[in-house]
A protein has these predicted regions:
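C-terminal effector/catalytic modules and regulatory tails appended to multi-domain proteins
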Residues: 1-10, 19, 27-34
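Conserved ATP-binding N-box helix of the HATPase_c
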Residues: 32-61, 107-113
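Conserved catalytic core of two-component histidine kinases
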Residues: 63-65
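Conserved helix-loop functional segments at active or binding sites
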Residues: 19, 23-26, 51, 55, ...
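Short, hydrophobic secondary-structure boundary micro-motifs
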Residues: 26-27, 191
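Flexible beta-alpha connector loops of hexameric P-loop NTPases
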Residues: 28-36, 95-97, 164
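Alpha-helix capping/hinge segments and adjacent helical runs
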Residues: 13-14
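GHKL-type ATPase core
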Residues: 1-9, 67-85, 93-195
Length: 195
């Protein structure tokens, strides 16, 4: 069979992730094992904040989890306001999953695998946010002189139940993961559901 322009299908960046989630987060599972993909994804997001802490920027991280819904609030420097969409969509060359952690594309992978995904960046008196549905950008905004939030980022997402039909985060597993991060990154305060 000869390949022609008519026989080659090009996928959007999020379609590839949604069709092949195991390439990015490992096995799907149901959330009953720390090796399940939902924890690989969560660790990738926490790694980003831990890196910011190690560089002297992130001061603390607050995480809230219920079922497949996650909210992370990192108190740090935020990302450049004009970079929010580029930081949360599209794929970088050479990405892929390692067994223990998602690469620097963790925000993008979470975005693609979620029913809804929002990303806010707060810097000084300005803020920027982007809202997505299953990887598709639905709204974005930069607001000058209206930010009352401390600098940093907020990521909220609800993983797509079609992709994770029997999964949910077990808080006891998340607590164990966070204890490992606290031991590895001494002095980095991480809270779970307000504690």
């Amino acid at each position: 069979m000869n390949s022609t322009g008519n026989t080659i299908q090009t996928l959007e960046w999020f379609e590839h992730i949604r069709l092949n989630p195991e390439m990015y987060i490992g096995r799907i599972g149901d959330g009953s094992d720390v090796e399940d993909g939902i924890y690989t994804l969560l660790k990738g997001l926490i790694d980003s904040s831990a890196d910011e802490f190690e560089m002297g920027y992130a001061k603390r991280l607050g995480i809230e989890i219920s079922g497949l819904a996650v909210s992370l609030r990192e108190y740090g420097r935020g990302i450049p306001l004009e970079s929010v969409v580029n930081s949360t969509s599209g794929l970088s060359v050479g990405i892929g999953a390692r067994k223990d952690v998602v690469t620097t594309n963790s925000y993008k992978v979470a975005n693609a695998l979620s029913e809804e995904f929002s990303f806010d960046s707060y810097r000084s008196v300005a803020s920027s946010w982007a809202l997505y549905s299953k990887g598709c950008l639905t709204d974005q905004r930069i607001e000058e002189d209206k930010n009352l939030e401390p600098d940093g980022i907020r990521v909220k997402f609800a993983l797509d139940k079609e992709l994770f039909p029997n999964s949910y985060y077990r808080l006891e597993i998340v607590k164990d993961i966070l204890e490992q991060y606290s031991a590895k990154h001494e002095g980095f305060p991480i809270s779970l559901n307000g504690y």
